[in-house]
Amino acid sequence: MDATERASDGWEPTLAAALLGAERAPPAASSALTALVAEADPGAALLARLAAEGAHHLAGQELGPEALAPLEERGRFGPDCPPAAATRLYALLTEGHGARNRVEEWFERAAATGTRPPAWLLQALMLQRGTLPAAAQAVVGADLDWLARACGESPAETGTVDASDWTEGTVAERRAAFTAFRARDPEAARAALEPVFRKEKADLREALVHALAAGLSAADEPFLEACLDDRANGVRLAAQRLLPELPGSRYAERMAARARAALAVESKRRLLGGTTHTLVVTLPEESPDLVRDGVEPNHWERRGGGTRAGLLRAILARAPLHAFADHPPRLWIELALRSEWADPVFHGLFSATKRTLDPDWSRAMADITAEAYEGKVTGVRRTNEVLGMWAEALDLLPDAEWEARVAALIRARKIEVVLAVLGQGPEHFSEGFSAALLDWLALVTRGSDSLRRDLAKPWVIARLGDRLWPGDDSAASAAAILARLPEGEGDRLRTQLTGLTSVLELRAAIRRDFRPETTTGGTAQG
């Protein structure tokens, strides 16, 4: 094709016309190709011109025959979502990073209803594919892969890693491949690692030891024990993090012996009946053996003179809970709170409980800290520190039990406690608990000025929008609370309630959009 023929290529003006739209585009210049278009409808005629000019344009670029091969059809992976839901998603996508949580919620609803975005949204989704939440992959991943192939691009990474060869690539790639290998066959993965481990560089050895967390079992203990003597500090740290997860390991038994040497319960019978218990604390000394197991004071403990107390806390945090089997958890925790070494002992035991999530220890932690804050534990004062311990202990409980206990606090109108515990707890609340919490908010906001000031202080209310049940009733309750807020109320509480109401209304609107009877969408703000 010579220069004159290239100049007559009508692809660019036809593409410009398509961008303008059939009704606004100027009439097409007369050519041999436009003469072939027989469609009367302007839109159909423009599409026909695009097809003809596109084929002519590609032919002029001297591409191979495969460039003109028809694309695969878009698969049918499920019905399109209702129009209102599609409109909502487009609005959320245009809002940027601030709407990320709502985009994730939209895709969760789409997955729950078995629907997907319509074809007209695929381009907008493709532009943001790198930042879409994980929930989007299951819903629209296949569609976006199809669009990528249609545009001559590579489909996105699916997150799955080929475990067939973990010996090549960057540190991150090899760690990911080895983790996949471990997930598939833990024993074979470790057996493959052991002969070559010492030959690898330190950063890779560290990464591979971290990867052993997948499928970790007692069979890994000899290898991890050997890693405690590795020349690289990162490898030793990685092994020190994993070994406490193996309660029957030599590491765990060493920690158990140290814990029993540091803590003991002395029991004496009283003359008039009953038994008194006293916690005897023997602070550990620094030693090379402790350092090998990852127990050494940090910089602040050395400067503040709390070296041995820090060692005690670290030992208890790593010890298996069976080291304290001679007495019930409740007794250990109560004595810890009453001890002059309450901070390292309680927090060490708490860390061990949090690591294992042992149900008996978790409930005992929640029970004793509650009693301590209510003044029912002799020798323990009611302080904000104890309240914080209570809130952290409640967070160890299963979601349903956490909600039941906090609901009891709500009924008892313990405002300061409820505000403290709401900073933790489940990521999402049940419908029943959400209703109870909103009723409590309504009650407190109708109370005294001091109550409303207390409610506004910790900025807890502002974060409830993502956690409360996203139903119409929740949104209506939040709006009613905001509407009844006294006019003279400060900006802090009003700002939080406004944000709470806005988030709940949007979340409720997203759910409504997926109902079959919904036919119009509105804006992303509901």
Regions found by a protein language model. Give the residues of each.
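Long, acidic/serine-threonine-rich intrinsically disordered regions with weak helical/coil propensity
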Residues: 2-168, 296-526
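Alpha-solenoid HEAT/Armadillo-like helical repeat scaffolds in large eukaryotic proteins
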Residues: 164-166, 180, 192-200, 211, ...
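Surface-exposed, low-hydrophobicity interaction/linker segments
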Residues: 166-170, 174, 179-184, 190
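A short structural micro-motif
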Residues: 214-218, 245-246
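Conserved hydrophobic register position within alpha-solenoid helical repeats
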Residues: 177, 208-209, 238-243
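Core register positions within helices of long alpha-helical scaffolds
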Residues: 106-109, 180, 211, 242, ...
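Short inter-helical turns and helix N-cap capping residues of alpha-solenoid HEAT/ARM repeat scaffolds
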Residues: 169-170, 185, 200-204, 216-217, ...
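Long alpha-helical HEAT/HEAT-like repeat alpha-solenoid scaffolds in very large eukaryotic proteins
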Residues: 229-326
